[in-house]
Swiss-Prot record:
Residues 1-23 form the signal peptide. Keywords: Protease inhibitor, Serine protease inhibitor, Signal. The record marks 83-84 as: Reactive bond. It comes from Solanum tuberosum (Potato). PROSITE patterns: POTATO_INHIBITOR. This is Proteinase inhibitor 1. GO terms for biological process: response to wounding. Belongs to the protease inhibitor I13 (potato type I serine protease inhibitor) family. Coiled coil: none annotated.
Length: 107
């Protein structure tokens, strides 16, 4: 019994010593925008109004509002992506119904 209790204590100590892995929050937006400004990306950088819009329509809106965007990638939500930042790219994350589910951001 004491051995099980000791294992539980060790488990909790180890678990609390690791940084939690969590999804980025909406509040992280200003940090992303500041990073993009450091890269001197021009034009509109975010499109929060496109959440819930069909992805093909959203792609057209992004290309119209920022003519410097030459790569608008449509990806299924949760798809792996590279971490490099490019001022000419926007990733549109959609669901299986074809609607934008995350805020499109330059990068």
């Amino acid at each position: 019994m004491e051995l099980k209790f000791a294992h539980i204590i060790v488990f909790f100590l180890l678990a609390t010593s690791f940084e939690t892995l969590m999804a980025r929050k909406e509040s992280d937006g200003p940090e992303v925008i500041q990073l993009l400004k450091e890269f001197q990306c021009k034009g509109k950088l975010r499109w929060p109004e496109l959440i819930g819009v069909p992805t093909k329509l959203a792609k057209g809106i992004i290309e119209k509002e920022n003519s410097l965007i030459s790569n608008v990638h449509i990806l299924l939500n949760g798809s792996p992506v590279t971490l490099d930042i490019r001022c000419d790219r926007v990733r549109l994350f959609d669901n299986i119904l074809g609607y934008v589910v995350d805020i499109p951001v330059v990068g």
